[in-house]
Amino acid sequence: MTAVKSVIRENYNMMKLREFLRENIKDSGFSGVEVEKNPRGTKITLHVTRPGIVIGRKGVGIRELTERLEKDFDLKSPQVDVKEIETPELYPGVMCNRMASHIERGTAFRRATMWTIQQIMEKKDAMGVQITISGKLRGDRSAFEKHTSGILPRAGHYADVIVLDDVVHVKTPMGLIGIRIRIARRDKFRKDFEMKAEKDVVPAPKPEHHDVKDETDPSAGTEAKDGAAAPKAGSESEQVEIEEEAMKSINTMEEDEEKLK
């Protein structure tokens, strides 16, 4: 086998592995997978939001997954490691799956898009986001819409370093719809250099002022207005069900046009 065919086959197997994991451990909040081959075997690292669902009771789930990966994908001595994602809203893979679940449940695609953008931009490390949705959105003809918020580098070194993207496809009664989410993360941004102040320069004292703190935290989007914490989801399916009620407060363009009439 030539080198070109070997690379193509390896990339094809990697694509099949991602699709298999996205479908089989979807409820655990699958974001991505890393495969590293060494003389001892194959190390597979799964990035998920809820590792307990993948591991299962007494490790039954991860053992079954390891056996299936070795059998179906011909991996030599696979060693599966699970890593938890601290902030799911900053990972395009997780948000793509959540948005696809909302559309499968019958939510309007624009409402799901606006809700996803809002959830991402509420995080302090989110610099920008772009969601592209294409397919049979409203009729027999295919169409696409692109929604952007914040700052999102399109080209250059920064675009390769700080921008993460993922694509997922969802089947609807109208046809197949593709969802692509690109997220620019501020925590991955590194400045080339920093200006240093001269040593003999003494900064002027800042005037003292007292801020009045509000009892409610505006950044806590998952908390209720009366101060009670929102119910915590045990899986991605429960998370989608919880978001369904909160998503009703977002108006789509069609609803805004009806109000203007």
Curated annotation (Swiss-Prot):
The keyword Metal-binding does not apply. Keywords: Ribonucleoprotein, Ribosomal protein, RNA-binding, rRNA-binding. Residues 198-261 are annotated as: Disordered. GO terms for cellular component: cytosolic small ribosomal subunit. SUPFAM superfamilies: Prokaryotic type KH domain (KH-domain type II), Ribosomal protein S3 C-terminal domain. InterPro entries: KH_dom, KH_dom-like_a/b, KH_dom_type_2, KH_sf_prok-type, Ribosomal_S3_C_sf, Ribosomal_uS3_arc, Ribosomal_uS3_C, Ribosomal_uS3_euk/arc. GO terms for biological process: translation. Belongs to the universal ribosomal protein uS3 family. Residues 17-86 form the KH type-2 domain. This is Small ribosomal subunit protein uS3. Residues 198-216 have a biased composition (Basic and acidic residues). It holds the Pfam family Ribosomal_S3_C. HAMAP family: Ribosomal_uS3_A. Binds the lower part of the 30S subunit head. Part of the 30S ribosomal subunit. One of its GO terms (molecular function) is rRNA binding.
